[in-house]
């Protein structure tokens, strides 16, 4: 399906530039409201949507625009204020609402923002519904009669409800007493949520990245910038550090020695913990970028591994297709569908902590069987529109390289979606093997 406005994770861009302008966002809210009203069942009354946001200064402006759009279409609005993206998904489902909307650009800088929708079930909107909304945006915006306008009000207990939900995903027989955690909230939506979750379960919590000012979200803190977390873990003598991104749907973990663990390793850890608890795990889903060492380690444990396109949306699609529950990507998007309908950094952290408590081991001990393969990435500049798949020299080089790597590495070649570059990535057991193979492939492209 060709999309004009919706990307793989909603509508996103630079604030003040199309499409992230107040007038467009109001039209977007109105269009989504019309689609929801049209699909509402007879006798259910007006649809109601939940709107949450992260801590970007532009969130106030875009929240007001969305509110105007929805209410002008005859849709009621509930406002949560700053709340993690997965919190909006949870509350949308728990409150039996028509849809949820998040104003966030996730891990991007503060000057970007975006709009993401959740269905009544707390899932990403189906493509067909997004297509309906895009079509409705192009129609004239007609305000509902005064008697049919929607109302807007704030939910004052949204953070508390979500905190209790997060805690409910942690085993009731376990607690976090005696554990010292550093929690990095990226000056984002989890700043007033995550520390409370872990503290209420018994942990001694040191918070960093928890003073948002509207412009410092993701700036030197959080899952995409873990250096300060590593420093804080060592400085405070903490057992573990947890880093979330701006909307708290990603997780990175640091151990007491300052070693960083990414989403690939954490996915393996959670799968193994489910198995240790006696739960059958027939398969797990990663992406094209998931480290091969994780795939091989899972297969040794009898777990089938499937690769989706990059993006948690596609991981979720593959999980649903197979009725599996566990998936994720190296960036820290982890899906535990037996706990939540969407990726949730706080819930994922609780699954990691549950594994540590259940086993009595450290992260390093639990992940002894997974040594990530070294990766070599070479970006080769090409002419715009270049078709690397038809390049005879590259295909010949690939045909020679892949048999040498079989069972010990892999090749991934893909075109960049944003610049005239072909990305050549090789993973192998040994760094020298990966570098040699990647250079051979890049040279075949004329690098």
UniProtKB/Swiss-Prot annotation:
Alphabetical GO biological process terms: carbohydrate metabolic process; peptidoglycan biosynthetic process; UDP-N-acetylglucosamine biosynthetic process
PANTHER family documented for this protein: PHOSPHOGLUCOMUTASE (ALPHA-D-GLUCOSE-1,6-BISPHOSPHATE-DEPENDENT) (PTHR42946:SF1), PHOSPHOHEXOSE MUTASE (PTHR42946)
Coiled coil spans: none
Covalent S-S links between cysteines: none
Entry-linked SUPFAM superfamilies: Phosphoglucomutase, C-terminal domain, Phosphoglucomutase, first 3 domains
Matches recorded under Gene3D superfamilies: Alpha-D-Glucose-1,6-Bisphosphate, subunit A, domain 3, Alpha-D-phosphohexomutase, C-terminal domain
Keyword Metal-binding: yes
Protein name: Phosphoglucosamine mutase
Reactions listed under catalytic activity: alpha-D-glucosamine 1-phosphate = D-glucosamine 6-phosphate
Cross-referenced Pfam families: PGM_PMM_I, PGM_PMM_II, PGM_PMM_III, PGM_PMM_IV
């Amino acid at each position: 399906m060709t999309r004009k406005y919706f990307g793989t994770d909603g509508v996103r861009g630079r604030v003040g530039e199309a499409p992230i302008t107040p007038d467009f966002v109001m039209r977007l809210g109105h269009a989504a409201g019309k689609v929801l009203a049209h699909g509402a069942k007879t006798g259910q009354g007006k649809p109601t949507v939940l709107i949450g946001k992260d801590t970007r200064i532009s969130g106030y402006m875009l929240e007001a625009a969305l509110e105007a759009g929805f209410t002008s279409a005859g849709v009621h609005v509930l406002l949560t204020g700053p709340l993690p993206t997965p919190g909006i998904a949870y509350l949308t489902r728990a409150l039996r609402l028509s849809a949820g909307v998040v104003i966030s650009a996730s891990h991007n800088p503060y000057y970007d923002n975006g709009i993401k929708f959740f269905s009544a079930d707390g899932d990403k909107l189906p493509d067909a519904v997004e297509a309906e909304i895009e079509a409705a945006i192009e129609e004239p915006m007609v305000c509902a009669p005064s008697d049919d306008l929607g109302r807007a009000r704030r939910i004052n207990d949204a953070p508390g409800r979500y905190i209790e939900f997060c805690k409910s995903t942690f085993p009731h027989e376990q607690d976090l007493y005696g554990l010292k955690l550093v929690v990095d909230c990226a000056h984002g939506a989890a700043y007033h949520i995550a520390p409370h979750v872990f503290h209420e379960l018994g942990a001694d919590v040191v918070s960093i990245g928890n003073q948002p000012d509207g412009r410092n979200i993701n700036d030197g803190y959080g899952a995409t910038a873990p250096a300060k977390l590593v420093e804080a873990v060592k400085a405070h003598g903490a057992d573990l550090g947890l880093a979330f991104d701006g909307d708290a749907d990603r997780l990175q973990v640091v151990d007491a020695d300052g070693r960083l663990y990414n989403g690939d390793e954490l996915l393996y850890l959670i799968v193994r913990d489910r198995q240790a608890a006696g739960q059958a795990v027939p398969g797990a889903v990663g992406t094209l970028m998931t480290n091969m060492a994780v795939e091989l380690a899972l297969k040794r444990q009898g777990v089938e591994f499937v690769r989706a396109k990059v993006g948690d949306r596609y991981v979720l699609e593959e999980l649903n297709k197979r009725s599996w529950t566990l998936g994720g990507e190296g960036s820290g998007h982890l899906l535990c569908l037996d706990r939540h309908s969407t990726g949730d950094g706080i819930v994922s952290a609780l699954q990691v902590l549950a594994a540590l408590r259940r086993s009595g081991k450290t992260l390093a001990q639990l992940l002894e069987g997974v040594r990530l393969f070294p990766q070599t990435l070479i970006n080769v500049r090409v002419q715009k529109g270049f078709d690397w798949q038809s390049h005879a020299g590259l295909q010949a080089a690939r045909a020679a390289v892949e048999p040498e790597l079989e069972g010990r590495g892999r090749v991934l070649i893909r075109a960049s979606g944003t610049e005239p570059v072909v990305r050549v990535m090789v993973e192998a057991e040994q760094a020298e093997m990966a570098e040699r193979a990647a250079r051979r492939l890049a040279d075949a492209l004329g690098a």
